């Protein structure tokens, strides 16, 4: 992110498997990304003292308990990362967290879960040129089962508006749903985006839905 050259130090896993070590971010920049602590909401990984966060309490009143996993805090350097990657279109930055994401999701893949990225509307995809979530999942198998209607950007909405927004997502025609699904997003804020997708998966064939985001 700082445009400095990267010194690659081989890691044990690459030495043992004779594979190439890939580093896409310098050590200095990577040190600014902070992982979520163990003191957090058990449902959505929000860092709080005590038990459930307010958002999860709201979801429970609607009959939904989040089952979410996240890795990093959405603050400071991570916000700058998404500004460059998502909004300024620096597609190369999708590679920075590939190893972190693979480490988090591979155990679920081994248990038979199918990764499902949050989609963009056709209008947003044409504007951005890529789906940032699919970029983060590069190298991992995933299935596109959802489509999305064009609506106002989430970032322009208030917290209350996000929670009460009508469902813009739909399941594509002739899609075979897996029994166990992981919905993957880039950032988790109130959980409204993921909740609307989970609603659509309330079907007999779907046994379990887990959700994941890079940042929380």
Predicted regions located by residue number:
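Glycine-rich phosphate/pyrophosphate-handling loop used in enzymes and phosphotransfer proteins
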Residues: 1-216
């Amino acid at each position: 992110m700082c445009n400095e050259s990267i010194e690659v130090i081989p890691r044990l896993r690459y030495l043992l498997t004779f594979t190439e070590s890939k580093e896409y971010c310098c050590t200095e920049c990577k040190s600014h990304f902070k992982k979520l602590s163990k003191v957090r909401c058990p449902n959505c990984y929000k860092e709080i003292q005590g038990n459930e966060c307010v958002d999860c309490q709201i979801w429970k009143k609607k009959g939904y308990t989040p089952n979410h996993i996240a890795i990093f805090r959405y603050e400071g350097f991570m916000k700058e990362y998404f500004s460059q990657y998502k909004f300024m279109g620096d597609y190369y930055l999708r590679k920075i967290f590939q190893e972190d994401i693979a480490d988090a999701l591979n155990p679920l893949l081994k248990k038979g879960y199918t990764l499902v990225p949050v989609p963009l509307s056709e209008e947003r995809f044409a504007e951005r040129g890529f789906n940032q979530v699919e970029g983060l999942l590069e190298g991992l198998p995933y299935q596109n089962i959802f489509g999305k209607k064009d609506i106002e950007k989430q970032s322009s909405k208030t917290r209350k508006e996000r929670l009460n927004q009508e469902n813009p997502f739909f399941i594509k025609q002739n899609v075979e749903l897996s029994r166990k699904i992981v919905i993957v997003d880039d950032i988790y804020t109130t959980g409204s985006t993921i909740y609307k997708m989970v609603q659509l998966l309330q079907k007999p064939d779907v046994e379990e839905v887990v959700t994941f985001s890079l940042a929380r």
